[in-house]
């Protein structure tokens, strides 16, 4: 769609982190936003991400589904507590308060993508989702990370393809 400057890029089904990489590399904008395809976070929420980053509130705007009380059917109890655990662990490791490490909704400058990828390669960081790599890279390079609350709804598209695997080094 030329009016809205939207491109649709078909990936090869290799997972979220590769799909995000493909999307970022094919984008033309100054900023990049990530929104998971299940639409459990609504597209309309991206306006607040753009506003936050464009006025300089942060270098990485990270969606947080855990600031507001999630819709009862939106997140399994195991996932909720797992997200809480990872947020606390990564907050402790990074000395940066993060309330949700696995919310797929994020916004950053496109030029920062190369820095995130360099961090991943230099540290042999393997993250199947890409969220941890983005967060750790931003913290490592001293970026201002801002959690932005989002409403999290029951998915309206597809079924999860995520397996319960942990990232590793």
Regions found by a protein language model. Name each.
Residues 1-9:
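Acidic donor-binding segment of Leloir-type glycosyltransferases
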Residues 39-41:
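Acidic metal-phosphate-binding loop of nucleotide-sugar-dependent transferases
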Residues 11-26, 31, 43-124, 128, ...:
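Acceptor/aglycone-binding surface of glycosyltransferases and processive sugar-polymer synthases
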Residues 123-124, 135-153:
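Catalytic donor-sugar/metal-binding loop of nucleotide-sugar-dependent glycosyltransferases
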Residues 2, 54, 139:
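Anion (oxyanion) recognition and catalysis
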């Amino acid at each position: 769609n030329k009016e809205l400057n939207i491109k649709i890029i078909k990936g090869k089904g290799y997972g979220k982190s590769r799909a995000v990489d493909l999307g970022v590399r094919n984008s033309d904008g100054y900023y990049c936003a990530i929104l998971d395809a299940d639409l459990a976070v609504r597209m309309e929420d991206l306006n607040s991400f753009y506003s936050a980053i464009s006025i300089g509130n942060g270098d990485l705007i990270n969606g947080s589904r855990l600031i507001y009380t999630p819709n009862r059917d939106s997140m399994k109890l195991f996932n909720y507590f797992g997200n809480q655990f990872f947020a606390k662990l990564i907050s402790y490791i990074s000395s940066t308060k993060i309330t949700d490490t696995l919310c797929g909704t994020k916004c950053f400058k496109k030029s920062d993508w190369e820095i995130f990828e360099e961090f991943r390669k230099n540290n042999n960081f393997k993250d199947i989702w890409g969220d941890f790599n983005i967060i750790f890279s931003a913290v490592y390079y001293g970026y201002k990370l801002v959690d932005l609350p989002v409403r999290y709804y029951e998915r309206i598209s597809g079924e999860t393809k995520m397996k319960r695997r942990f990232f590793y080094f």
